[in-house]
């Protein structure tokens, strides 16, 4: 069964959006295979966003993602990677359609509420970064 990594970012946790976001995924029929509330360390943030290391926004991205607790999860279901991306909406809130998570809740490109794996390969890498095998149910 296909799995993807999803993270509700500090702005989503701070604004009390965790329950609503989880409910949307459950209503779609996705199974939660793992879930935890956590603070991301500087090292984990840098590893997670390694592809952006040379970009000018990298320090701000790491600073933001380590600024408060996040909810990390693994969702499972047919076509889950692509479907979660669709449910999240465009990265920039101004481009995100109403009815998508970012369209409904994101305020800026920096505080866009949620992260989801872009590909199956990214999902496998990100799941391994955030969860030990025994944490996956």
UniProtKB/Swiss-Prot annotation:
Task: Please list the coiled coil stretches.
Answer: none
Q: Could you tell me the EC number(s) of this protein?
A: 2.7.4.6
- Its primary localisation, in coarse terms, equals cytoplasm
Which UniProt keywords are present, listed alphabetically?
Answer: ATP-binding, Cytoplasm, Kinase, Magnesium, Metal-binding, Nucleotide metabolism, Nucleotide-binding, Phosphoprotein, Transferase
- Fetch the Pfam families from UniProt: NDK
- Complex and partners: Homotetramer.
Q: What is this protein called?
A: Nucleoside diphosphate kinase
Species of provenance: Thermus thermophilus (strain ATCC BAA-163 / DSM 7039 / HB27)
Gene responsible for this protein: ndk
């Amino acid at each position: 069964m296909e799995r993807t990594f999803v993270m509700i970012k500090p702005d989503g946790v701070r604004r009390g959006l965790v329950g609503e976001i989880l409910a949307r995924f459950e209503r779609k029929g996705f199974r939660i295979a793992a879930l935890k509330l956590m603070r991301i360390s500087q090292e984990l943030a840098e590893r997670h966003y390694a592809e952006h290391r040379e970009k000018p926004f990298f320090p701000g991205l790491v600073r933001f993602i380590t600024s408060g607790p996040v909810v990390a999860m693994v969702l499972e279901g047919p076509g889950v990677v692509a479907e979660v991306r669709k449910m999240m909406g465009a990265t920039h809130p101004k481009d995100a359609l109403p009815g998508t998570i970012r369209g409904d809740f994101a305020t800026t490109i920096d505080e866009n509420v949620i992260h989801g794996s872009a590909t199956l390969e990214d999902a496998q890498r990100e799941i391994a970064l955030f969860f030990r095998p025994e944490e996956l149910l």
